[in-house]
Amino acid sequence: MKCGSREVFVKLEEGTNPQWGKPPSSRSAEEHIRYSFLILDKPRGPTSHEVAAWVKKILGVERAGHSGTLDPKVSGVLPVAVAEGTKVLMALSRADKVYIAVAKFHGDVDVENLRRVLQELQGEIYQKPPLRSAVKRQLRTRRVYSLELLELDGRYAVLKMHVEAGTYARKLIHDLGEILGVGANMRELRRVAVSCFTEDEAVTLQDLADAYYIWKKYGDDTYLRRVLLPIEEIARPLPKIWVRDSAVDALCNGAPLAAPGVAKFEHPFSRGDLVAYFTLKGELIGIGRALVDSEEVKKMEKGLVARTDRVVMPRGTYPPMWRRGGKSFKSGT
């Protein structure tokens, strides 16, 4: 998923009524927690479900959920959404992943031959999930964006792999060994990125516990806001569509996004892509799926732009003007 590489096309110059909603930075600490997610650095040992449960316990919320399960022995980047934020975890459902893996070959390998095979494995590959897998063992295609040798020491290699969601790193290393004719197995694995989110911005469970304690004990939420990101950040990998105030409540009720409701949007995006709906104050409304591509949206005056799949903003945050054909709000009027 591309991040930060899209242009913004303005369809309609329009302001937003300050009486409705609020910028994410204006939320109280309690509201910030309920509409947040974090980039967690999962340690080796616990399951991803256990880690999400600990987040829920630390923050005292009713639910927390993760995206992209990591096996107990695997460490690294694990996005975890909190409370209401779990409703839009699907924003990361197609997120590509980057791993650093340690592979052990069962025989000696030539470094140039290894690099050649790594190059050959880039692109579209066929994979069948391993025996111990939570999904049905069907042959499927996955894309390997890059496969790089970082270090070779005897029969041990350090590899960096950038892969499509749902790619099994362990199986990829097994296949690498088979192609080389010596066999190989994975000895260690760390996930260093999920789409735009890297280990550089990941926090630990201890960071989270400390931040929450400082807020509860001293009333200082500065650290808490650094550890817990506003839920709007979860949409970082997706094209954004900013909608008029008059369209917000309709989307909150699950209606599709119609062209007259669009104020501006990021492009390019294609039909079928996930898109994120935002208010003009920068609040995340929900996630939809584009019914047309961005070039068509530029010219559209009527018709449907996207189907609404998930909503995070509560109904009634903005008035239901869509029921009575509400007027737009102009800046300075």
From Swiss-Prot:
A biological process from GO: rRNA pseudouridine synthesis
NCBIfam families: CBF5, PRK04270.1, unchar_dom_2
Keywords: Isomerase, tRNA processing
Molecular function as annotated in GO: RNA binding; tRNA pseudouridine(55) synthase activity
InterPro entries xref list: Dyskerin-like (IPR012960), PsdUridine_synth_cat_dom_sf (IPR020103), PsdUridine_synth_N (IPR002501), PUA (IPR002478), PUA-like_sf (IPR015947), PUA_sf (IPR036974), tRNA_PsdUridine_synth_B_fam (IPR004802), TruB_arch (IPR026326)
Reactions catalysed according to its record: uridine(55) in tRNA = pseudouridine(55) in tRNA
Family: Belongs to the pseudouridine synthase TruB family. Type 2 subfamily.
E.C. no: 5.4.99.25
Function description: Could be responsible for synthesis of pseudouridine from uracil-55 in the psi GC loop of transfer RNAs.
Active site positions, chain numbering: 71
Domain called PUA: residue spans: 238-313
Group of enzyme by EC: isomerase
Name of protein: Probable tRNA pseudouridine synthase B
